[in-house]
A protein has these predicted regions:
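Pre-Walker A adenine-sensing motif
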Residues: 1-4
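Conserved Helicase C-terminal RecA-like lobe
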Residues: 6-10, 16-20, 24-36, 196-329, ...
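SF2 helicase motor core recognition
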Residues: 15, 22, 71-76, 118, ...
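Conserved Walker A/P-loop ATP-binding site and its immediately adjacent core
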Residues: 19-27, 34-54, 123-128, 286-287
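Inter-Walker segment of RecA-like/P-loop motor cores
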Residues: 43, 57-73
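Conserved P-loop NTPase motor "coupling/switch" region that bridges the ATPase
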Residues: 81, 99-190, 358
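Walker B catalytic acidic pair
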Residues: 85-86
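A conserved SF2-helicase RecA2
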Residues: 341-350, 354-405
C-alpha cells in the first residue's frame, strides 16, 4: 500500500468487512514521511471504533475523525491525508452527490494523499466508481470532463421505459472500469485473512395481531384507510402501497400527515421472549420500529456501540446506518426486526458479527405471517433489490387491483 500511495498519492483499499481496513489505512499514514494531520471521514456510528484503533496504534500524526454529514464543520485546509471510509457511498450517478462534491473540494484544496476504503467498491454497478475518484488528481478517469463523457468509453448506455418516458440507463458499466482501477487498488478477502467463519440464517415467523392483518387487507382493497381525521394511510400509487404494507406488516405506519405510530408490538415482544438471557444486536428498518422496541425493552436497549460493548444492554441499529463500518462482535446473535429492499443492506448487515476468531455466526430474520418480508428476502439473497416490479408480481390478490395504481 505504501508503494502505491507514494507513487500515485492515491490508494483504494478494497478489503472485505472485518479484515482491518481501518488499521491498515492508519498504518500506511504512519509510514508516510510528510503526514502530520490526517482526516478520517466515516459514518457517525463508526467514529468511536476508529478512535479506539487510533489510540491502540498510537502513531505520530494527529487524527480527526468526522462523519460525512459534518464535513462543513472542519477546516478546509491543513490535511496531509484524507481517508474516506465506506467510499462506495460517494458513487451516486449520473450526478455527483453532495458528499462526493465535498470530498472533491477538500482533496483539491489540500493536494494531499487520499485513501479510499470499502468492502464493496461497486455494490450495484461498476458505474459507481466514477464519482468516488473523480476529484482525485491522477485518477484513471481524469481525462473525462464529466460522468457522461466517462460513459462514452466505459458504460453501455441503454434506454428504459419509466412511467411512459424513455430514460437513459447508465448502470451497465463495463469491466474496463475495474481494469483501469487495478493499479490503484489493493483487494483483500476474509479467506486471505484466515477467516473460517460461517453465517447461519434462520427465519422466524411471527403472528401479528388480527387488527394489523385486517388493516393490511383494507389498504390493499381500498388504497386508503382513514383511522381518524388526522391519521390517514394513503396508498394511491404502487410505490406507496409497497411502502405502507412494508411498515404495517411489522407493526408501524407513517400517516399522510407525517406522523408515525406503533400499532402492533408483536415482533418486539417475540424478540424479548425468544432471546431472553442473550445479548443481541437488533436491526430495524423504520424509525417507528425503534419506538416499538423501546416500548418493550425499556432501559435494556441502547443505540450506541460504546454502551453496547461496555454493558449487558442490547443494541438497536437502523439497517442502512448500521450495516457498514461497525462491529457487533459482542453480540451473541443478530436479529432483523424487518428487512430492507436493498441487496447491499442484506449482505453487509448480516456480516456485522464476523471476526477472524469467531467460527460461527447466527442471524435471525423476523417475518410476519402472511407479510411482505419473505418476498423481499427471496429477492435480496439473489443480490437483487426488491422493486415495484417484484411487488406487483407478488401481491396479486383478490383485494389488490394493479390496474388502479
Amino acid at each position: 500500500g505504501c508503494d502505491v500511495i507514494n507513487m500515485r498519492k492515491f490508494l483504494y483499499l478494497a478489503m472485505e468487512v472485518r479484515t482491518g481496513k481501518t488499521l491498515t489505512s492508519l498504518g500506511i499514514a504512519q509510514k508516510l514521511v510528510r503526514v502530520n494531520n490526517v482526516l478520517f471521514i466515516t459514518k457517525k456510528k463508526a467514529i468511536s471504533s476508529i478512535e479506539s484503533d487510533y489510540k491502540m496504534l498510537d502513531p505520530d500524526y494527529d487524527l480527526t475523525v468526522i462523519n460525512y454529514e459534518s464535513l462543513h464543520k472542519i477546516p478546509e485546509k491543513g490535511w496531509d491525508m484524507i481517508i474516506c471510509d465506506e467510499a462506495h457511498t460517494l458513487g451516486a450517478f449520473p450526478k455527483p452527490s453532495k458528499r462526493a462534491k465535498q470530498v472533491k473540494s477538500l482533496v483539491f484544496k489540500n493536494n494531499c494523499f487520499v485513501v479510499l476504503l470499502s468492502g464493496t467498491p461497486t455494490p450495484e454497478s461498476y458505474s459507481q466508481m466514477y464519482h468516488q475518484v473523480y476529484g482525485i488528481p491522477g485518477n484513471p478517469f481524469s481525462e473525462f470532463k464529466n460522468f457522461y463523457r466517462f460513459c462514452d468509453k466505459h458504460v453501455t448506455v441503454t434506454q428504459r421505459l419509466i412511467n411512459g418516458f424513455n430514460i437513459k440507463d447508465y448502470s451497465n458499466g463495463k469491466q474496463s472500469i475495474t481494469d483501469s482501477m487495478n493499479r490503484f487498488m489493493i483487494s483483500y478477502t476474509q479467506v486471505q485473512a484466515g477467516f473460517e467463519s460461517s453465517i447461519e440464517e434462520e427465519i422466524l415467523r411471527v403472528p401479528m395481531k388480527t387488527k394489523t392483518i385486517e388493516l393490511c387487507k383494507r389498504l390493499k382493497r381500498d388504497l386508503v384507510v382513514e383511522l381518524t381525521d388526522d391519521d390517514v394511510i394513503l396508498a394511491d400509487t404502487g410505490v406507496k402501497l409497497m411502502s405502507k404494507l412494508h411498515q404495517l406488516y411489522s407493526g408501524t405506519v407513517k400517516f399522510e400527515s407525517g406522523n408515525s405510530a406503533v400499532i402492533d408490538t408483536s415482533k418486539a415482544n417475540f424478540i424479548k421472549w425468544k432471546f431472553r438471557g442473550s445479548k443481541i444486536g437488533i436491526f430495524y428498518k423504520f424509525k417507528a420500529e425503534l419506538d416499538a422496541l423501546k416500548q418493550v425493552f425499556g432501559d435494556a436497549l441502547c443505540t450506541d456501540l460504546e454502551t453496547f460493548d461496555s454493558t449487558d444492554k442490547h443494541i438497536a441499529l437502523q439497517i442502512v446506518s448500521g450495516r457498514e463500518g461497525i462491529s457487533l462482535r459482542n453480540a451473541e446473535y443478530i436479529v432483523f426486526y424487518n428487512i430492507d429492499f436493498s441487496a447491499t443492506s442484506y449482505w453487509q448487515a448480516r456480516d456485522r458479527m464476523t471476526t477472524k476468531d469467531r467460527k460461527y455466526n447466527k442471524v435471525y430474520w423476523l417475518f410476519s405471517e402472511g407479510g411482505i418480508e419473505s418476498k423481499i428476502y427471496r429477492a435480496v439473497i439473489q443480490k437483487k433489490d426488491y422493486t415495484l416490479k417484484h411487488f406487483r408480481r407478488d401481491v396479486q390478490t383478490t383485494e389488490f387491483r394493479p390496474g388502479r395504481l
